[in-house]
Amino acid sequence: AVVHAETSTGVCNPVEKIGRLVKDNSALYLVDCVTSLGGMAVNMDDWQIDALYSGTQKCLSCPPGLAPVSFSDKAVEKLTNRKTKVPNWYLDLSMITQYWSGKARVYHHTAPINMLYGLYQACYNIFEEGLESVIERHLTLHQKLVNELNGIGLELFVEKNARLPMLNAVEIPEGANDGDVRSRLLNEFHIE
C-alpha cells in the first residue's frame, strides 16, 4: 500500500514505478488517492494498481462523505474467492461487489443519495472543463505560486521532482514563528 499524494509532507510518491515492481508479484497493490484524484494523473491500469480509493473532499471539489473505490479484476477475484469470513459485516466488500456484478443484490447500506448527486455534479464539472485542463490548471497555478514564493525568498520543502501540484509545503524561514505565519495566512488571506 502507498499514498500517492502525501498531504502531511507535500510529496508525490512514485506510484507508477512502484506498480512496475509489484506487477509480477501475487500481492495486491493498494493506492490511496484521496488527495490526487482529480488533481493529477492517476492511471490505475497502466500503473498496475489493484485497489484504489479516494475521498470526495479534495481535488474532486465535493463535500466530504464518500470514498470512491476501484478494483482490478485481480482484486475482485481475491475478494470473491476469500475463504475466511470477514469479521465485520459492514466492511465486507464481497457483498458490495454484488452491486456491480448484476447478481441478486444483498442490502448492505443506505446510499447517501444527496452525496451521490454532489459527486455527479463535481465529476460533471471536471469533465466539462476537461480532466487534462484541470490537471494543467493545477500545474500552472502551482508554478505561479512557486515563482512568487521564490521571489520573496521562500523555498518549498519538497524537491521539484517529487512535489505535488495541488499542495505546496513551504519552508518557514529561520526565526519566523510557524503559528504566527499560519494565523496570518488564515486571518488576512483566508489560506489554510
List each model region and its residues:
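Active-site phosphate-binding strand-loop segment of PLP-dependent enzymes
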Residues: 1-36, 51
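Fold-independent oxyanion-binding glycine-rich loops
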Residues: 2-6, 31-34, 40, 55-57, ...
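Short, well-ordered, mixed-charge alpha-helical segments that flank or form enzyme active sites
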Residues: 7-12, 37-41, 46, 60-63, ...
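Active-site C-terminal subdomain of aminotransferase-like
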Residues: 57-147, 151
